[in-house]
Structure formats: C-alpha cells, structure tokens
Amino acid sequence: TGDLAEPGVAATLVDAVATRFGGLDQLVANAGFAARQSFSELSADALASAFAAMPGAFSALAGRARPLLEASIAPRIVAVSSFVAHRYRADAPFAATAAAKAALESLVRTAAAEFAARGITVNAVAPGFTRKDHGPSAGNAAAWAQAEQATPLGRIAEPDDVAALIAFLLSDAARQITGQVIHVDGGLTL
C-alpha cells in the first residue's frame, strides 16, 4: 500500500501482485482526489499533485504491468476518469482535477494504441456524480439535490453503476473495445 503519486509505489504494488498471484490479467487504475480550486486560485503545487496522482500513477502502473499483461490471455486495463474532464462548472471548481483527468484520458488512448499489438485493451470510464460512503445528510442534502437536478436522468449514479461498466470492460465481451472513454453519468456530459 502507499500513495501512488510517490515514485516507486506503483512498481512495488505491481511487483507484489505478480509475486502473490503469479501474474496479472487486469488492471484498474482508480487513483485520484478532488482538489477544489478554481483556475484563478490554481497553484503549481495543486496541479503537480493532481498530475502525479492521476496520469502519473496511471502511467507508472500501466508501464510496470505491461510485461505481465502481455503474458495474459485476456489482458485489460481500465482507468477511472471523471466528467470534470469534459464539463467544467464555475460553481464546482476542480481545475487541477479536470486537467489531470483529461491528461489521463489522453494517456489511455496513447497506451491503447501502443499496447494493441500485444492484445491489451486500454479504456477509461468517466463517472458523473456518484454516491460515496457519505450519502445525503442534513449538511449536504441540498448539494445532492442539485446534482440530481443537473443530471438529465434525474438520479445520481451508485458505485455499482460504475463498477458494472468496469466489469464489462474487463470481460471477454469487451475484447474489441480499446482506446475509449465511456461515460456513466446519466447524461451529464450531453
């Protein structure tokens, strides 16, 4: 365990998985955090942290995992992005996160192009508003209601909605899908 933004942590993690399980068939890169800063307030440190935690961690994980995935009969990589890479809102400023997730999606496409010859699929899912462990409460009920209202389907995604898409992309049914960013956002990015 450790912070994937730190040098060497991704390699240690992939190596530990390979040692424990004798290989690696699938990788889901879900590292990230939401730095609440507008573009006007954006600091170099916040931007660097976001890039280290998201596209940097993905690059380190996928790069280290590649030889193991090449030995698999059904190698898959799925990265978790976010709708913020596609829809910026002034009332919910996440400039560093938006930029980092957009860079992550670009790396997904780059890796897909480079890894395809070895049969490795590389895709991303981009969730919209998704309920977390701390669902609506008296302190945040208005924010959840606003998020539901902003989502064309009128509901917030559950973690299982996102997990189902990831599971599909890891399955044999998705063996012809690579280099894609698939939104699971209730129409938020329409």
Regions found by a protein language model. Give the residues of each.
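Catalytic loop of short-chain dehydrogenase/reductase
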Residues: 70, 76-103, 108-117, 129
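Conserved NAD(P)H cofactor-binding loop of Rossmann-fold oxidoreductase domains
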Residues: 30-36, 186-187
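A glycine/serine/threonine-rich, flexible loop-to-helix segment
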Residues: 91-93, 117, 124-151, 161
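Amphipathic alpha-helical dimer-interface segment in Rossmann-like NAD(P)H-dependent oxidoreductases
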Residues: 53-73, 85, 112-113, 117, ...
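Substrate-binding pocket helix/loop in short-chain dehydrogenase/reductase
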Residues: 38-39, 46-51, 135-136, 143-147
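C-terminal substrate-recognition "lid" of short-chain dehydrogenase/reductases
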Residues: 59, 155-184, 189
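Catalytic Tyr-X3-Lys loop
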Residues: 25, 33, 40-60, 78, ...
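Short, small/polar-rich loop/turn modules that mediate ligand/substrate recognition or access, typified
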Residues: 23, 28, 74, 116, ...
